[in-house]
A protein has these predicted regions:
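Sec-dependent bacterial lipoprotein signal peptides
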Residues: 1-28
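Structured C-terminal helix/loop/strand segments within mature extracytoplasmic catalytic/sensor domains
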Residues: 5-6, 29-58, 62-86, 90-92, ...
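Short, conserved catalytic-motif segment at the N-terminal edge
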Residues: 91-117
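Mid-domain, small-residue-enriched loop/turn segments at the edges of structured enzyme/sensor domains
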Residues: 95, 166-221
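Active-site-proximal beta-strand/loop segments in catalytic clefts of secreted hydrolases
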Residues: 101-103, 154-158, 166-170, 183, ...
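Active-site SXXK
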Residues: 106, 117-141, 154, 282
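Conserved catalytic neighborhood of penicillin-recognizing serine enzymes
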Residues: 136-185
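A conserved catalytic-loop motif detector
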Residues: 200-261
Length: 323
């Protein structure tokens, strides 16, 4: 069967020949000449095949860049940014534990310091809020409207006074018995001058515990409680705009930060989420070990988040705080 184009050409040629035959008959007869379109293959000029290009003359087709080595189930782009974070942290003061989790794929990256215990500072307030909200809904305790206002301020401005109010009202054993259920499996309580443990302000844990805590918030809490905490952590006071907040507004971050001065020096922590639908969780704990202060620590944890979620560093936070 002829291709459609060839068949159409043949029909046109036949039509022209038919018309010519009719005209010749009307004139008393004439000879038909072959149309140029009907030239026989023998009379057509022979085609000369083009020489094959040499291997060196052919333009090389660029191959796509190889996906960097890294934790399974992360995108190639995220793997590259994780490598950038590793390189960045080599030149930062102190010890920084980092855990990144992709809730969509289940991918998890833990750096080499992720399992080292660090003072929690005010990140323990998030664990307190989770315990209070969960047990209130279960009917184990009752949170009054006043308690809820105190809880909100404890998260929004990281009020130590409000944390004390809720800690002593419900008792240390209420929290310590519940914390392992929400991810703080390795938490320890340490002594400090004038403080008898256990106390929310003198807790230590590794970044892996903080990662499990924020994962519990997003994956295991009832929808109403999860929604409350996501909204609250997404609208914290400006002095909480560091750490995970470095992901940038386009990534809709939310975080609970913490800072304190302990025996090892300044402690700067941040735990929270970023990405559409809180896709990623990020936990960071920075013990500066006497090699920097508040600004060095907040810059470090902010740049880690910025590199992971923006692909580049950002201006260092300009906020300040006192221990």
């Amino acid at each position: 069967m002829l291709p459609a184009v060839a068949l159409g050409s043949a029909v046109k040629v036949a039509a022209r020949r038919g018309a010519a035959a009719v005209a010749c008959a009307a004139l008393g007869g004439c000879s038909l000449l072959s149309s140029p379109a009907a030239t026989s293959p023998a009379s057509a000029p022979a085609s000369v095949p083009a020489p094959a290009p040499s291997p060196g003359s052919a333009a090389a087709t660029p191959s796509p860049p190889a996906c960097p080595a890294g934790p399974a189930k992360f995108t190639c782009g995220m793997r590259a940014r994780i490598a950038e974070v590793v390189a960045y942290l080599k030149h930062r003061p102190g010890v920084v534990g980092v855990v990144l989790r992709d809730r969509s794929t289940g991918a998890v990256w833990e750096n080499r310091f992720a399992h080292i215990p660090v003072y929690m500072a005010s990140t323990s307030k998030l664990a307190m809020a989770v315990a209070l909200l969960t047990q209130n809904q279960a009917g184990v305790i009752h949170l009054s409207s006043g308690d809820m206002s105190v809880l909100h301020e404890m998260l929004h401005v990281s009020s130590d006074t409000d944390a004390d109010t809720l800690w002593f009202k419900f008792g240390a054993s209420f929290y310590t018995g519940f914390f392992p259920r929400i991810g703080l499996a390795s938490a320890q309580y340490v002594s400090a001058p004038g403080i008898t443990p256990p106390y929310w302000g003198e807790m230590i844990c590794p970044a892996t515990d903080l990662s499990r805590l924020i994962t519990y918030v997003l994956d295991d809490m009832p929808a109403s409680l999860r929604g409350y905490l996501v909204a609250t952590l997404s609208h914290v006071a400006t002095d909480q705009h560091f750490g995970v907040w470095g992901a940038g507004s386009a990534n809709h971050p939310g975080n609970k930060d913490g800072w304190s001065v302990e025996k090892p020096g300044w402690i700067i922590n941040s735990v929270g989420f970023a990405g559409p639908g809180q896709r990623y969780t990020l936990a960071m704990m920075n013990s500066l070990n006497g090699h920097g202060g508040y600004h060095a620590g907040t810059d470090t944890v902010t740049q880690v988040s910025a590199i992971l979620f923006r692909g580049h560093q950002v201006q260092a936070p300009t906020i300040s705080a006192t221990p």
